[in-house]
Amino acid sequence: MTAVLQANALEVTAGQRVSRCIGPPAHPYAWVFRPGRLNGTHFLTPAVLDMQVGVLERARGERVQAHTHVQQSRKLNSSSELLYVERGRVLVDIYDEDWQLLADELLSRGEMLLLLRGGHALTVIDDARVIEVRQGPYSGVDKCFRDGG
């Protein structure tokens, strides 16, 4: 695994999968994940984040042992979102808490974006299907829109 620190972003390469951290690695705004091959199970995000992204690359016939996850109380300070582009292309603008644009990421089929803090906007470039995973429960009132819209 190699890491390259760039202006306001950290790129981590594990095998052929590249992830890019937007914002300071210790307190990121977002992680971008590009497709690639890995062997085994790899978590692409640091263990301290509120939401984890992992990849399981396994051969036919392999089995993950039956298991359960122990219930734990966790304190979360924000709601995280994962966007997975199943088809098409979307452009995601990523903002800090003061609505300053940090990055704009063009996502294509098979790519993911983990949004951890700050704001974001999405523009559909080509007809797309995007799967969104977020922490729940969702009350419907935990969004704050830029420009009051």
Where are these regions (language model features)?
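Double-stranded beta-helix
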Residues: 8, 123-149
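Short acidic-glycine-tyrosine-enriched beta hairpin
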Residues: 96-117
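A short, N-terminal "cap"/entry segment at the start of jelly-roll beta-barrel domains
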Residues: 1-57
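Short, surface-exposed beta-strand-loop junctions and turns on beta-sheet-rich folds
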Residues: 72-73, 98-100, 129, 137-139
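Short beta-strand His + acidic residue motifs that chelate non-heme Fe in jelly-roll/DSBH
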Residues: 66, 92-93, 113-115, 119-125, ...
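Conserved short histidine dyad/triad with adjacent acidic residue
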Residues: 55-77
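Glycine- and acidic-residue-biased ligand/ion/polar-headgroup-sensing regions
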Residues: 59-60, 78-95
